[in-house]
Amino acid sequence: VDTALKENETPYSYYTDELISQVTEALKEQLGYTDTQASNLLFSGGLQIYTPQDPQIQEIVDEEVNNPANYDAARYSVEYRLSLTHPDGETQHYSQETLKTWLQQVKGQSGFDGLFNSEEEAQTAIDEYRTALTQDGSTVLGESVTMILEPQTSFVLIEQSTGYVKAINGGRGQKTANRTLNRATDSLRQPGSTFKVISSFAPALDACGATLSTVYYDGPYSSGEKEFRNWWGSDYKGYHTIRDGITYSMNIVALRCMADTVTPQLGVEYAERLGITSLVSQDQTLSTALGGLTKGVSNLELTNAFAAIANGGTYTKPVFFTKILDRNGKILIDNEPETRQALKDSTAYLLTSAMQDVMQSNTMYTRSGSGVKSTGTTAAIPNMSCAGKSGTTTSNVDVWFVGFTPYYTAGIWGGCDNNQPLKGGTVSNGGTSYHKRIWRNIMTRVHESLSDPGFTVPDSIETADVCRKSGKLPVSGVCSSDPRGTA
């Protein structure tokens, strides 16, 4: 793509916003430019910037992210700022939080959750609030209102073999300005169970001698004063493998794997190997196995971590531009991809194999007889090999699905900007599965003309029959390594 950036009245796309940031940093780091020099060259220097963005894929992503039919409901949050001068000369400031409190306490809407059913309903509430605040003769110094369509979404699609970012979308709804919040690259959100793969199971397989058949006990589990449960409740299942832990997103299996085999320190180290840069020392805890992080992660970095798995364990820094030429056609920067081996190819394949099961119809039965199903079947795409992992945070504040095919890796985040829990039913603000449908719809369209080569099995993979209960090589007639004791 030959791009000459100019200031204009049409807001840049989310991709262009990130491209500007990436090019600016490259000009500063590689050529020694100041912020001002880089900006002047970028917008007025006649640069030719070549990007790997795929216009057709980008169009598909934008269409599906903004298609109302892909959402169970549409509601609106408000970013509100109001400054008043009271009759006594005092200046006071108000926000969406004070508006929410007023609606709950003064207007009797105790159940108001910060979301409105329409823009008109939101504006009516704002008008009433302003009127109530100015009844004493206070005057308005300034006011700003931004309506935000909820639930929000971000999407990232990467070609894992090259690191080329083919498309991103930083939020649904009309983009009204340049360099606004880009939920795909700027927002740090809790990753939930997607992080089990990165911080617990990947290092266990890669560095600690575990296999997909290594077993951990799914039962009551606590650390310090914190008690952990599985996402389906307190109905435990006994001994289960790492493969089961991934397929059914078993919290206790992931926690015991980190505690007994990996250690939180190694878990954080592996997440950083896979390109997660937002971790801090306080994240060296067991909660990291479940994605309970201090700051959270960006969609771009989380998706790219899975792209490394899809690429046989080779991490490639995300590429938004391939080269920059000056106005005379001279190459200023040739952006060669930065790569490193983050995982063994055997580890990457084992994780891929287990995450294929996530997207297939599998059911595991609890001791009470109730069924727990694999968590990614809604996202499965027809006639194409795919592997992935879902993630949901406490109270359904964030929902994720990150997965890949032999061609592309894609990640979707869903949630409300104001951290309102996602709900279904009669008070729906989006539900907790819409993101998987969007992921499936986008990836189905992207792969329509592509054949399915399957996932390549590396030469380093060896197969063997193992005891299902112990994860060890079986003994003919009896499994003497069964953790419950010999038969």
Regions found by a protein language model. Give the residues of each.
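Substrate-binding clefts and substrate-entry loops adjacent to catalytic sites
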Residues: K28, T34-F43, E225, D244, ...
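C-terminal substrate/ligand-recognition segments
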Residues: I148, T153-E159, V165, V197-F201, ...
